[in-house]
């Protein structure tokens, strides 16, 4: 439990550190959910009832409003009767008096039309000038039984629908009567009627809406809650909270993708601690945000009746289930490319489905079962919470619903269910990495009750049947403990080309206190074996045991012993060195009190003491490997797997690692894979060689040399200048004259080696004497002799394996291969052809698209689903929308129309109840009146009536409040008519109710007013929208925009990925024309776009006539949109480093900007249509043009709205589009779209051609470089003087005063990566560029390839200035970069074919060249497999092949053999040697043997400066002297052996000593190498030595002297120690 707590604490710290490094992500996590909730909150605010009380409107304002209009009147009988005429005259006189008009003028305003048809016609023609009309149906006079009748006529859209009485929606409100002209006419007519019948009282009438009954805050949300939150609330909540799931799943999959999690598991990670740590990390920000969301929803009373605890608890439980779902979904992703986006979409889609589960009635049990899916559960919960708050207006069948309490129970159950799923799926889901259980594992006894395997008996049985004569069966030493037993381990892969056996029944034992080196060619199965041993890869068959625990079923026990340094770096870029070591120390069980000390100690031990607080991302490649080494060793690990731990390290760093391994091997079993055979020989107590997945041999280095080597190894170095005329046969014949049994081993590059049998030792003296004399005549520079080396053993076994398998053999077909190589190299580029490049690049895009199904799905299928979905929705929403009231059925405005309502009464209030009753008791509806005492506030009564049993608010159409008493003496009838908005005719009804009652009381004559609407005169908007569904058009276009935005975003992802992976850089350096690169991408993406365009336009043409008639416009618009948005997306991709981020962000950018602009534009256009304002239209046009310039998606939407005939698309004063192509309509957006294409493509070209442009504007050669260093080597100075004095010459590569200063980053000072270097390399020379990691080698190559612009200085390639004539300078360049820039979705064959096209290899020769390189590089077995699955060595071979294609004159090889085995490395040397005959080769390498084999001239860089310059022999002579010899003593003779050697060879110096190894230097050699060899042979006969090697002072010694002060310190320390002895 203590270990669990410690791990949990460490993982939490790790996660929080990672989280804290991304401030932007934290801000998004906090702000995004709150913004999402605020969005729905804003929507709810828009529809809420803002006021509990509403202001009264004056209804007695006819005279004031009667301006510049006319009033029509007439009688159906052809003339008005005396009463009607009298009333109208009174009304006329009132207007005339108020406005001071004469009779003629007033007659022009009151027009009598006694023909209904004529009146209708007049209104239709001049509706804008008609205030209202009064129509009398007959000429009958009024009486007690026949009220005064009149009809008020206004536009049907200015009154409510006369065919309905009650309408409960937000748009229905009796207020329209008072806002428009109906009530004003009604009150004016009633006033005139009063006057005509002698009632001289002035009507002062107001209309006022009922006070909102929902006075409390929670009630104000009713409309939004019912229409929006009840259904969509859960979607917004899910979207808000899923941001944490998005971040979590992305982090989880990234750790899986980079193998970090599995590496942690290998070293003791507790899965429970891992998951809990991520859960807690997510909750650190998620819980506070979740609480804020709860406070917003509950505190604002959007959720009211549900108590605080339920709301908060529900959201917390739901958040937990979302995070657990993120864990579950992460199991099914191996790549982080789309995991977050797809998971987000999946969860939202499920939640939307949950809305329908919540809404529709079906078995509650089934609903509860579906609530096992938590997004469905939250939909049911939000629906239930909203329903409780809506019970006052809606009725719900709770028997068919899931309550919020039930949902809480289900969410709790969900949590336990999801935890089980996380555990189960983590054990059984097969992914790219990790060993998984059988699906039924939880039902097996061995899972719950594991037993430690008793392997000994099993081993005896297996061992008795295992026979391999090339295995040293007895361990070295006495009493060695077997810690690892591998038994018939097998791994098979189905590659698509058949079954490939990676590991073939491997049988091997490894021992404690030993380093067991695991060697083999690339692809031999070394890394696969380690993967199976550590649980990274499940075995197909067999088993292995670590301390007795089997890897098949007891991997968790195995991993408690493991420390692993895999081939790839398992680091977090943002964490420091110390952070890493502390994390892994805790995982391995180091006590908390010791973690800090152990981590600091380990950092110093792996030579990272000065970098302990530096972020891992800032470390060099070698330093990252050291960090991984420290991670493997820290803590309790006693079984260490090191997979190419020193790969990419310089010699000094490699020696540090060697010292470390020898120091820490005690008590441990170390399994080491390496391609440096001297490293295996130096470190390995036992060495196993695997070939084609099968164990070839195993034993100590001495055993293998005795078994597979014989005698001595003579290694000669050729004079580079005589390479073309070198005759190896001549040397061989000379050797055979003295030693007939000598055999040639290797003739690669400048190296020539022979095996000399032991029996030939007596002939050595005479042979070497003659050989020394003829060395120069043979074209040889130096030679050395040693006993059989491990490399010879490796090469020998490699030949045997090749013969057995019929595979690659460097020697068997040497002449044939070299001849084929010469032919292939001789096929030169015939000149870069844009057409050929374009074809190759287009084929690249086609093949990568076909192979990347997910990208294809995202690029084409999902956008197509969006587009087709939008079209289906558009078609489904086919019913035309009517935005006006067109009902013309007459409706009498009296209370009788609402008489059917139960408990309906009219509340009335007056200052005098008796007076009130006496004044209104003549009304036929008097029994419906109810007096409200003056002591009670009338409006409060109406408000409280919602819960008052005596007053049913919903059943009350209106109320009357008299502000003055009604009596005989009063001259004014002053009252307010309150109306219930749901009773849509309430206001005129209640005004008539009072006026009718008052007149009846006066002279027993009533008033009957009828609403008789005119047929609606269509407005411009009505005309424009007639017959269409505007909502469907808007939704259709918005969804269509989303589809095309996603398409554009996905196109950008590919470009971002190629830029980040440096594929584009290599293409450019290889000669790809920049415009061709972009053209190929554009054409392919345009092709995809064309598919969508064709489908879209054809489908639209089939469903709508307007789309069919404007097919050409639509088609061209989409074409122009795509040709403009694709390059814009490319441009935006420069801000993003990965496919997923680029796709998601750019899609959001396009869509968000487009939608915002569309909303603004539509509102402006509709307002223009309504106002018919030309100036406003010009302003809207200007806004649209600006929006079109800023967003191609908006420009496309403008055409869509135009063709869809959206209201407002037409010009002011017109009803139809006369010419869709005119500048007023489609012309301007189309021209702007075309301009977009030109602008964005030009912008991209400018960005890409910036180096060339800089060269024209600011040539670095005109900028003065800093002065040369004071301590500059004389040879470097001589080269500088020579070049600067003679000026340009015919040497292919020259650079003068080359300097690169990188600006300061943060607090760091500016760094001079390359310091004022001058150099010229002649044709036919291989130049070595050496130095420690970070010395400036790669920066130099990058400047020579044009990838980095120098700060100062000039580079000339084949006479062309790299800055001012970049294209010609780089025309014949080849580059093998340090990090493979391969297209992972293409095979080696496909990549070579592509680069043949890029480099201009004749098309009829491409296949021949490609097949030759595949054969020579031994890639035949995997040539059709994607390079993403290649081993590191095979990737290097592919990269080298690309560099050599097209016979370039200058080839830069940046560590070309890193990760390659000895066989392949030798072959690469042959290739490079062949290239060097007529080319310039620039080579960087950390292998000194490689440099000696290949390079004629070299320099060693330190801190960006060249520390030496010249031939290898010159540098050796200048900085080293005499001979060096390395010996391996028998263990018991280490100390005495060193003293023996020092006494036997005077003046010898101890250079280095490690364990049983020692290196000596003889500054003043006593004699030639044969004498020294004779001396060591005699020592070996005395059983002091196991092995030795004699040679001239090694280049590595010189390298260490020139690059490392620590080397000199150690040299002095060694010699002081042995001198004192």
From Swiss-Prot:
Q: Name one GO cellular component term.
A: membrane
Give the keywords, sorted. ATP-binding, Membrane, Nucleotide-binding, Repeat, Transmembrane, Transmembrane helix, Transport
UniProt subcellular location: Membrane
- Segments passing through the bilayer: 30-50, 234-254, 276-296, 309-329, 338-358, 365-385, 405-425, 856-876, 1033-1053, 1083-1103, 1111-1131, 1142-1162, 1183-1203, 1227-1247
- Can you tell me which residues bind ATP 2? 1331-1338
How the protein sits in the membrane?
Answer: Multi-pass membrane protein
Q: What does the entry list as the binding residues for ATP 1?
A: 520-527
Q: Does the keyword GTP-binding apply?
A: no
Matches recorded under InterPro entries: AAA+_ATPase (IPR003593), ABC2_TM (IPR013525), ABC_transporter-like_ATP-bd (IPR003439), ABC_transporter-like_CS (IPR017871), ABCA (IPR026082), P-loop_NTPase (IPR027417)
Q: Which residues form the ABC transporter domain?
A: 484-717, 1293-1528
User: Chief localization class?
Assistant: membrane
Q: What GO MF annotations does this protein's record show?
A: ABC-type transporter activity; ATP binding; ATP hydrolysis activity; ATPase-coupled transmembrane transporter activity; lipid transporter activity
Q: Name one GO biological process term.
A: lipid transport
Give the family this protein belongs to, as stated in its UniProt record.
Answer: Belongs to the ABC transporter superfamily. ABCA family.
Q: What is this protein called?
A: ABC transporter A family member 2
Origin species, per record, is Dictyostelium discoideum (Social amoeba)
């Amino acid at each position: 439990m203590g270990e669990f707590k410690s791990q949990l604490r460490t993982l939490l710290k790790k996660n929080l550190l990672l989280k804290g490094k991304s401030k932007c992500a934290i801000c998004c996590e906090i702000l995004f959910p709150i913004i999402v909730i605020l969005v729905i909150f804003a929507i709810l605010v828009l529809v809420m009832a803002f006021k509990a009380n509403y202001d009264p409107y004056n209804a007695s304002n006819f005279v004031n409003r009667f301006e510049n209009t006319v009033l029509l009147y007439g009688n159906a009988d052809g003339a008005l009767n005396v009463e009607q005429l009298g009333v109208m005259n009174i009304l006329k006189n009132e207007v005339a008096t108020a406005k001071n008009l004469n009779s003629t003028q007033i007659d022009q305003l009151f027009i009598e039309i006694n023909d209904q048809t004529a009146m209708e016609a007049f209104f239709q023609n001049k509706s804008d000038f008609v205030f209202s009309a009064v129509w009398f149906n007959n000429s009958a006079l009024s009486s007690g039984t026949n009220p005064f009748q009149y009809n008020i006529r206004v536009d049907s859209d200015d009154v409510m629908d006369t065919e309905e009485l009650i309408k409960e929606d937000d748009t229905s409100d009796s207020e329209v009567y008072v806002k428009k002209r109906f009530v004003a006419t009604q009150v004016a007519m009633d006033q005139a009627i009063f006057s005509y019948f002698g009632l001289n009282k002035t009507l002062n009438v107001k209309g006022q809406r009922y006070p909102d009954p929902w006075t409390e805050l929670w009630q104000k949300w009713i409309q939004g809650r019912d229409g929006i939150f009840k259904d969509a609330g859960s979607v917004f909540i899910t979207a808000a909270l899923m941001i944490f799931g998005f971040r979590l799943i992305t982090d989880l999959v990234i750790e899986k993708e980079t193998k970090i999690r599995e590496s942690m598991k290998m070293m003791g990670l507790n899965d429970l601690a891992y998951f809990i740590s991520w859960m807690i990390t997510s909750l650190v920000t998620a819980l506070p945000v979740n609480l804020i969301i709860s406070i917003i929803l509950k505190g604002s009373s959007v959720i009211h009746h549900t108590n605080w605890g339920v709301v908060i608890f529900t959201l917390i439980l739901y958040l937990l289930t979302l995070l657990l779902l993120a864990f579950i979904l992460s199991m099914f992703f191996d790549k982080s490319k789309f995991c977050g986006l797809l998971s987000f979409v999946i969860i939202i889609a499920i939640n939307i489905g949950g809305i329908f589960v919540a809404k529709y009635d079906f078995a509650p049990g089934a609903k509860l079962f579906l609530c096992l899916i938590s997004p469905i559960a939250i939909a049911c919960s939000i629906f239930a919470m909203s329903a409780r708050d809506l019970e006052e207006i809606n009725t719900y069948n709770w028997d068919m619903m899931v309550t919020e309490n039930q949902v809480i129970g289900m969410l709790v159950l969900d949590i336990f269910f999801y935890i089980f799923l996380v555990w189960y799926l983590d054990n059984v889901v097969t992914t790219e990495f990790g060993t998984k259980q059988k699906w039924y594992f939880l039902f097996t006894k061995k899972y719950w009750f594991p037993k430690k395997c008793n392997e000994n008996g099993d081993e005896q049985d297996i061992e008795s049947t295992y026979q391999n004569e090339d295995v040293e069966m007895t361990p070295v030493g006495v009493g060695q403990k077997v810690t690892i037993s591998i038994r018939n381990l097998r791994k098979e892969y189905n590659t698509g080309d058949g079954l490939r056996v990676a590991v073939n029944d491997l049988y091997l034992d490894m021992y404690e206190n030993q380093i067991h080196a695991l060697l083999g060619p690339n692809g031999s199965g070394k890394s696969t074996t380690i993967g199976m041993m550590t649980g990274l890869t499940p075995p197909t068959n067999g088993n292995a045991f670590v301390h007795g625990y089997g890897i098949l079923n007891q991997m968790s026990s195995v991993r408690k012993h493991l420390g692993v340094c895999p081939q790839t770096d398992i680091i977090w870029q943002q964490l420091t060195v110390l952070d890493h070591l502390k994390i892994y120390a805790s995982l391995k069980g180091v006590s908390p009190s010791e973690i800090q000390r152990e981590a600091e100690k380990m950092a110093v031990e792996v030579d990272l003491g000065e970098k302990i607080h530096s972020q891992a991302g800032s470390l060099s490649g070698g330093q990252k490997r050291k960090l991984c080494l420290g991670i493997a060793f820290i803590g309790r690990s006693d079984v260490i797997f090191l997979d190419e731990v020193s790969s990419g390290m310089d010699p000094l760093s490699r020696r540090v690692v060697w010292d470390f391994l020898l120091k820490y091997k005690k008590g441990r079993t170390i399994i080491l894979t390496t391609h440096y055979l001297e490293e295996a020989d130096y470190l390995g107590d036992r060495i196993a060689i695997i070939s084609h997945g099968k164990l070839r041999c195993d034993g100590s280095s001495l055993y293998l040399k005795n078994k597979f080597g014989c005698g001595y190894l003579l290694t000669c170095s050729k004079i580079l200048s005589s390479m073309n005329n070198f005759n190896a046969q001549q040397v061989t014949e000379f050797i055979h004259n003295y030693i007939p049994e000598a055999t040639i081993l290797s003739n690669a590059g400048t190296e020539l080696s022979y095996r000399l049998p032991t029996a030939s030792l007596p002939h050595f003296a005479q042979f070497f004497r003659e050989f020394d004399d003829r060395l120069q005549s043979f074209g040889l520079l130096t030679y050395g002799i040693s006993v059989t080396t491990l490399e010879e053993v490796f090469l020998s076994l490699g030949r045997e394996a090749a013969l057995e398998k019929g595979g690659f053999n460097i020697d068997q077909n040497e002449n044939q291969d070299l001849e084929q190589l010469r032919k292939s190299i001789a096929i030169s580029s015939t000149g870069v052809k844009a057409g050929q490049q374009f074809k190759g690049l287009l084929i690249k895009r086609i093949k990568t698209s076909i192979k990347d199904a997910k990208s294809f799905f995202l690029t084409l299928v999902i956008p197509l689903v969006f587009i087709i979905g939008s079209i289906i929705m558009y078609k489904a929403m086919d019913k035309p929308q009517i935005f006006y009231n067109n009902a013309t059925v007459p409706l009498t405005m009296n209370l009788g129309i609402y008489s059917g309502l139960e408990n309906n009464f009219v509340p009335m209030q007056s200052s005098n109840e008796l007076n009130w009753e006496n004044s209104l008791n003549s009304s036929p509806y008097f029994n419906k009146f109810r007096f409200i005492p003056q002591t009670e506030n009338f409006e409060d009564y109406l408000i409280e009536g919602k819960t008052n049993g005596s007053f049913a608010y919903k059943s009350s159409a209106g109320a009357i409040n008299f502000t003055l008493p009604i009596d005989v003496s009063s001259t004014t009838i002053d009252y307010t008519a309150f109306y219930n908005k749901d009773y849509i005719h309430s206001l005129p009804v209640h005004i008539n109710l009072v006026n009718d009652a008052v007149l009846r009381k006066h002279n027993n004559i009533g008033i009957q007013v009828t609403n008789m609407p005119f047929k609606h005169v269509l407005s411009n908007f009505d005309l424009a929208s007639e017959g269409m569904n505007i909502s469907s058009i808007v939704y259709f276009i918005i969804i269509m925009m989303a589809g095309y935005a996603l398409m554009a975003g996905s196109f950008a992802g590919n470009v971002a990925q190629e830029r980040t992976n440096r594929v584009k850089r290599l293409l450019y350096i290889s000669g790809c024309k920049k415009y061709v690169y972009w053209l190929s991408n554009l054409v392919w993406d345009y092709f995809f776009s064309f598919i969508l365009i064709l489908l879209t336009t054809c489908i639209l043409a089939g469903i709508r006539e307007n789309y069919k008639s404007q097919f050409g416009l639509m088609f061209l618009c989409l074409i122009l949109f795509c040709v403009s948005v694709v390059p814009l997306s490319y441009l935006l991709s420069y801000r993003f480093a990965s496919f997923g981020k680029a796709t998601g962000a750019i899609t959001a950018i396009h869509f968000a900007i487009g939608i915002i602009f569309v909303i603004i534009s539509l509102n402006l256009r509709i307002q223009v249509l309504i106002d018919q304002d030309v100036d406003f239209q010009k302003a809207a046009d200007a806004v649209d043009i600006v929006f079109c310039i800023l967003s191609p998606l908006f420009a496309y939407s403008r055409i869509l709205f135009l063709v869809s005939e959206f209201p407002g698309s037409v010009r002011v004063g017109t009803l139809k589009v006369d010419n869709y192509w005119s500048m007023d309509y489609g012309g301007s957006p189309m021209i702007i779209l075309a301009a977009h294409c030109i602008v964005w493509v030009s912008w991209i070209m400018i960005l890409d051609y910036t180096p060339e442009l800089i060269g024209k504007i600011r040539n670095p050669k005109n900028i003065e470089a800093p002065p040369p260093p004071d301590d500059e080597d004389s040879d470097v100075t001589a080269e500088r003087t020579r070049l600067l004095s003679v000026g340009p010459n015919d040497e292919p590569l020259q650079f003068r005063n080359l300097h690169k200063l990188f600006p300061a980053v943060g607090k760091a000072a500016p760094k001079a990566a390359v310091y004022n270097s001058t150099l010229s390399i002649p044709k036919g020379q291989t130049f070595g560029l050496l130095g420690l990691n970070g010395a400036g080698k790669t920066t130099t190559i990058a400047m020579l390839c044009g990838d980095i612009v120098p700060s100062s200085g000039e580079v000339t390639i084949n006479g062309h200035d790299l800055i001012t004539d970049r294209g010609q300078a780089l025309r014949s360049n080849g580059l093998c970069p340090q990090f493979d820039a391969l297209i992972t979705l293409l095979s080696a064959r496909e990549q070579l074919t592509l680069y043949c096209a890029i480099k201009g290899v004749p098309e009829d020769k491409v296949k021949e060249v490609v097949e030759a390189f595949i054969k020579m590089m031994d890639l035949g077995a995997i040539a059709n497999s994607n390079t993403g699955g290649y081993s590191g060595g095979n990737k290097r071979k592919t990269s080298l092949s690309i560099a050599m294609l097209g016979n370039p004159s200058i080839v830069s090889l940046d560590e070309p053999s890193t990760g390659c085995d000895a066989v392949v490395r030798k072959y690469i040397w042959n290739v490079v040697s062949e290239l060097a005959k007529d080319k310039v080769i620039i080579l960087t390498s950390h292998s000194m043997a490689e440099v000696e084999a290949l390079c004629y001239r070299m320099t060693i860089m330190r801190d960006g400066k060249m520390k030496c310059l010249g031939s290898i022999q010159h540098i050796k002579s200048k900085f080293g002297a005499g001979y060096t010899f390395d010996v391996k003593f028998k263990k018991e003779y280490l100390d005495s052996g060193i003293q023996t050697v020092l006494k036997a060879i005077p003046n010898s110096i101890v250079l280095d000593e490690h364990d049983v190894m020692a290196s000596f230097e003889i500054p003043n050699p006593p004699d030639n190498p044969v004498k020294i060899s004779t001396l060591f042979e005699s020592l070996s006969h005395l059983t002091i030595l196991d092995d030795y090697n004699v040679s001239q002072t090694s280049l590595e010694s010189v390298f260490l002297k020139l690059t490392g002060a620590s080397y000199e310190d150690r040299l002095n320390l060694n010699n002081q120690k042995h001198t004192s002895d």
